[in-house]
């Protein structure tokens, strides 16, 4: 809400309504031994506290809502998540964070390594979230995606801000590459 926050743990981020989906879904996202259902509700349960389990009816409603909204296939919440395609695993992870009702959603390479159909569905959901007022921080090396989806582009190199660009007719993949290339070594 326009104020700075000192976040030092995932639980503090959840409490501040900030969600982060890592680019490394296999090592930092999914828990391979759990079902789709268990992976999807994980963040909501963590936010609520492990001593207060979510009622089964609430779990089922959340799982149904996000599996349907994100078109997770196959639509079997009890299937091990490791049996899903990479794109569907990514959709479950996005659903996990959406279920926490974030005000800020940080997506790190959300479409890397997934098929074009899943990529399109995820991007449509991201656009809908932005339209609903969720602040999206979209980290991507796919510059065409960045240009198409962004109101504002901050170009970083070696942890330094090179430029803060507004999305207008002059913002293109080439203009971003030029910004990076023109930076003195």
Where are these regions (language model features)?
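Glycine-rich phosphate-binding loops of nucleotide-dependent enzymes
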Residues: 1-185
